[in-house]
Amino acid sequence: SCGAAAIGYPCCENTCTEVYTDEYRWGVENNDWCGLKD
């Protein structure tokens, strides 16, 4: 699972590049934000 799921975002399906970090770690997949798995 990923932290971003707690606020309603999907988890990244594939390992993708981390593009932003706040309280969660974010990637972009299919032109949408996704949370990187912990």
Language-model segments: what does each one mean?
Residues 1-38:
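Extracellular/cell-surface secretome signature
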